[in-house]
């Protein structure tokens, strides 16, 4: 299991339910069924997770959009 991916997917899923400012580490742990120690073994804090999601998910989707535009 890719732990970082599990937490990033959880964050993206929780964003459909509540604003980012209201999402807690506890929410992520409940959603992923992983431990707090596991979270902190992979991320410094929630902001570190947000940066990871930005770098790995959002930037990739943004770049895929440009690839699509250039292909047309």
How does the language model describe each region?
Residues 2-24:
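Short, amphipathic alpha-helix enriched in basic
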Residues 7, 11, 43, 50, ...:
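DNA major-groove recognition helix of helix-turn-helix
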Residues 17-47:
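Helix-turn-helix
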Residues 32, 54-55:
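Contiguous, function-dense segments enriched for cysteine-driven chemistry
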